[in-house]
């Protein structure tokens, strides 16, 4: 299994300018040289998760299908239910006409905007609906106007990971008739999984005709007692590496959740007059040495020895 610091290091080592090409080359190396067989999990949301699924996985399909083992796709950000199962669209097939289905969608849509659009399902076909609202002098809705109705093809984000993987790699059906991904591929999700979310995911997969065994959950502290490293705001992260004398920034910047952006490259920590600290990202080697950070370990050697008592005293200052 891989995690973000090692993964982003590999991506930027192969191609720091073109992240998609760098990730393609890095993953190909992992699949063919490092882990040519067996169970292999890869975190795929470091930069562009949906771009990874849409462009990189199809390119590596033959390699994945020829491996003696299972390749596991791992997203780690975004709306967990939508990432796994895709978006949920309301079926208005009970309406007598497509136009009345569009109006029903407008009535159900909760918004203060005068123009909005959305996607509905009608008679096994998806449609994109564009609506305008007319209002009276009091600002209350007077009427809905259907501007456009166009046939709509679901995007990769609309379908979600499981359906998209099935489209690419195919699969079989269980004895109960549910779709099961090919044995060479599956997915895992372990970020913020609760019992309630797990149940919602299984229900959505059931509605779409997919077996629950297409996804594995990583269940840890959040599910058990909702205490994690984030409870104290503490984590240890790699932000920079030197490979063949080359400085390589290590950072993630997932499109699926900008709040998970990490620190990048060499860091300079500045102590302000009020005692607070400011961190500067991706600085030069010279700038990094001017900050408050002090080397503790280097090349396997302990450079600064402190007792726990000294560390506790520093924390409480």
Functional labels for PLM-detected ranges:
Residues 1-175, 195-197:
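Buried, small/hydrophobic-residue-enriched core segments of structured protein domains
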Residues 90-110, 232-254:
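Acidic, Ser/Thr-rich peripheral helices and adjacent loops at domain boundaries
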Residues 171, 180-187, 214:
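Short beta-strand/loop segments at the ligand-binding rim of alpha/beta enzyme cores
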Residues 187-195, 219-223:
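Glycine-rich beta-to-alpha transition loops that act as phosphate-gripper elements at the mouths
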Residues 208-235:
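Glycine-rich phosphate-binding active-site loops on the catalytic face of alpha/beta enzymes
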Residues 239-282:
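An anionic, glycine-rich sequence signature occurring as long contiguous blocks
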Residues 264-317:
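Extended hydrophobic packing segments that form well-structured cores
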């Amino acid at each position: 299994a891989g995690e973000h610091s090692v993964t982003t290091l590999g991506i930027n080592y192969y191609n720091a300018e073109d992240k998609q090409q760098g990730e393609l080359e890095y993953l190909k190396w992992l699949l063919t040289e490092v882990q040519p067989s067996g169970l292999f999990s890869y975190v795929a949301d470091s930069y562009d998760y949906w771009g990874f699924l849409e462009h990189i996985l199809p390119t590596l399909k033959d390699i994945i299908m020829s491996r003696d083992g299972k390749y596991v796709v791992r997203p780690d950000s975004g709306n967990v239910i939508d990432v796994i199962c895709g978006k949920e669209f309301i079926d208005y097939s009970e309406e007598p006409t497509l136009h009345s289905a569009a109006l029903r969608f407008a009535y159900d849509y909760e918004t203060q905007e005068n123009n909005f659009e959305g996607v509905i399902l009608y008679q096994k076909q998806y449609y994109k609906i564009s609506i305008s609202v007319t209002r009276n002098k009091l600002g209350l809705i007077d009427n809905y106007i259907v501007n456009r109705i166009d046939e709509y093809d679901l995007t990769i984000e609309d379908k979600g990971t499981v359906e998209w993987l099935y489209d690419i790699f195919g699969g079989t059906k269980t004895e109960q008739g549910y779709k099961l991904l090919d044995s060479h591929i599956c997915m895992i999700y372990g970020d913020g999984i609760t019992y309630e979310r797990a149940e919602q995911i299984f229900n959505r997969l059931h509605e779409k005709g997919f077996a629950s065994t297409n996804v594995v959950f990583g269940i840890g502290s959040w599910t058990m007692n909702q205490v994690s490293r984030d409870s104290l705001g503490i984590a240890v992260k790699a932000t920079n590496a030197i490979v063949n004398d080359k400085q390589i920034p290590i950072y993630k910047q997932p499109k699926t959740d900008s709040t998970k952006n990490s620190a990048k490259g060499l860091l300079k920590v500045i102590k302000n007059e009020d005692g607070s600290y400011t961190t500067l990202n991706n600085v030069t080697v010279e700038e990094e040495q001017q900050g408050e950070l002090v080397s503790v370990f280097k090349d396997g050697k302990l450079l600064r020895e402190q007792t726990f008592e000294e560390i506790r005293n520093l924390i409480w200052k």
